[in-house]
Every structure is written in C-alpha cells, then in structure tokens.
C-alpha cells in the first residue's frame, strides 16, 4: 500500500513513518505546507495519514483541504491533530480538554471495531493534547474508543474508510500501537471495507 503521510510539524512524524514501513507499506512524507493541492494530486498514493501536530486543524496547512478533496475516495487515518481534523470536517465540536494531557498515559476501552483487532478491550496509550472532540452526535462518525472518563479516543466514519485516534500509536508507551497501524493498513487495503457487518462490533455511547 502506498501511503502519503502528511507531516503537521510533529517531532515524532518519522517514528510514525517507521512504524508504517514496518507494516510493509510504502510511506512517503510531505509537510503540510510544502506543496499545493494540485501538486499533491500528482503524487501516487493509495491512502492518507495525518500526523499529530501543534495548534488546531485550521492551522495545519493543507490538511483540511486534503480531507475535503479526498475524504470520499481515499482511506484516511488521523492521529491526534489529524483525528481532530476529521472530526471537525464532519461537524464535531473541538473543545479544550478539562485537563491537558501532554506526555501522559491513559487506559483506553475500545468497542471491538476492526481497527482494534487483536488488541485487548482495555489497553494503555500515550496522549499529547489539550483539545478533544466533545461529541459525535449529528455527524456520520461513531465513537469506537473512550477513556474511563468518557473522552473520545477513536472514531470511525459509518460508511467510508476514515478513522481517527486521539492517542499516539507511534509512542513506545502505547500498548499495541504497531498492531493498530497494521489493522488500519488492512482496513485501508480492503475493497470490502464498506461492506463490513457493523453488527460485529459496537459503538461507545
């Protein structure tokens, strides 16, 4: 699978790239302000990954425009800032977290979505963020992982291969981070994604 990793000026982007390469994928990295939208269209890629980064999605160069351009034709994975960008694009509200979580781990509970295949229902993940998506109500997105406090930690579009994780799978302090990325590659590569039986996993209210 040919992946284009959009670098939102995050210091761990190349850790993420290395993990993606370990899955067997081909991964190219481009800064979010390095190319025009038309230049991105000349790159040969089959899936998009949006890296973590500072500030808000609106400050992340071409990331919002790439989501608008490719959301209905290219599989996507948003991580931290990228997760927030996907949520905002589909109408979710991005708010300040009650407590900033920079370099802190948390226990995450997932719903059984294929993104978490072979990952225990409860696992530990690293968090670096002060903003989060408050609700996915009235959007085409579903929550597929939360903290014990109910904070949204992962989302999935209900009919498109678009996924987001607020935590950092590229961190060594995230359990099963590489497995999560392998699962996403499997989802992105599968032409049958839209036909997955949604009754095989739940959502988290």
Describe each PLM feature range:
Residues 13:
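Active-site-adjacent helical/loop segments in soluble small-molecule enzymes
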Residues 172-205:
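Acyltransferase
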Residues 45-117, 181-183:
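Cysteine-nucleophile active-site neighborhood
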Residues 26-32:
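Short hydrophobic/Thr-rich beta-strand motif most characteristic of the beta2 strand and flanking loop
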């Amino acid at each position: 699978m040919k992946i284009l990793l959009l670098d939102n000026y995050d210091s761990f982007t190349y850790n993420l790239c290395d993990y993606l390469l370990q899955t067997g994928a081909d991964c190219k990295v481009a800064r979010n302000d390095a190319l025009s939208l038309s230049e991105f269209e000349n790159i040969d890629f089959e899936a998009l990954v949006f890296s973590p980064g500072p500030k808000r999605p609106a400050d992340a160069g071409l990331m919002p425009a790439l989501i608008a351009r490719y959301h209905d034709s290219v599989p996507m994975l948003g991580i931290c800032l990228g997760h927030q960008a996907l949520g905002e694009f589909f109408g979710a509200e991005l708010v300040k977290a009650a407590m900033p979580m920079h370099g802190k781990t948390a226990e995450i509970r997932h719903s059984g979505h294929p993104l978490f295949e072979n990952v225990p229902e409860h696992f530990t993940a690293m968090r670096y963020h002060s903003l989060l998506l408050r609700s996915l109500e009235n959007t085409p997105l579903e929550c597929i992982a939360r903290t014990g406090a109910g904070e949204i930690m992962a989302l999935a579009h209900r009919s498109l291969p678009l996924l987001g994780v607020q935590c950092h799978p590229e961190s060594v302090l995230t359990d099963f981070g590489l497995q999560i990325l392998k699962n996403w590659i499997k989802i992105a590569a599968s032409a049958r994604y839209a036909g997955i039986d949604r009754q095989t996993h739940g959502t988290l209210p």
